Amino acid sequence: MIKLLLKFGEKQFMERVRDGHLYFTNALRLRGIEKELLIKGQGDQYEGKTIITGHRLTLGDGSVHNGVFNVIFSLEPANKLPVFCLYTCFEKDCRQDSSGNWVPQLSDDVKDMVSEHFPKADAVAIISNPEQFIQDVLVEFGDGCKHGLVKYAPTSDNVGFLNDMLHAENAGHVGSVYFSLFRKDTFFTKEQEYRFVLSDKEIEEAQEISIELFNGCNIIVKGLDEFFDDMKGEL
């Protein structure tokens, strides 16, 4: 069960999240962050893609070649769907304080991941009522908003990718290509992502989209050093 949701980033942007201004990106941008800025973690050059391995390749001229061939497969309509990502705190990632409230208690491995994958992050937005936050997002965007936990599997798991594609199509979802944005390579497992994907919208570049946060949605922003210091001595 999800206890908390966290967003790591620069303080000025985390304060915007606190006020309901969510920074959505897209698959093209996430690929570029790794390929151009060389930040693997925040970025992923295989975002929304899978690698299909074949042993027989037929070219357009009809010629046939035998061997081992890796083909990178992606769904172009998913490239510009808006994506908003969060870190998920389960019970194993938390503790209860003296008032019975859940507070983050991340492992050293996860702390290291945050520092390595999000090198510009100096703050964290802590969402203490995930259910209310999720509901607020759904109220704003309606049925076109797909949300849930990311599935982690090898990028080469094309069978799983294709099965998910068939499931999404059979379910009759609007913009069923969104499913490809809920799969990531096992390298990213520690990110424990919860994602919102707007399957009926497109954005050319990352942009802020505002929602109304209702009274039950409490978001606190802390400096990252303070956030990590609060966990010391509490294990």
How would you label these PLM feature ranges?
Residues 1-235:
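NAD-dependent ADP-ribosyltransferases
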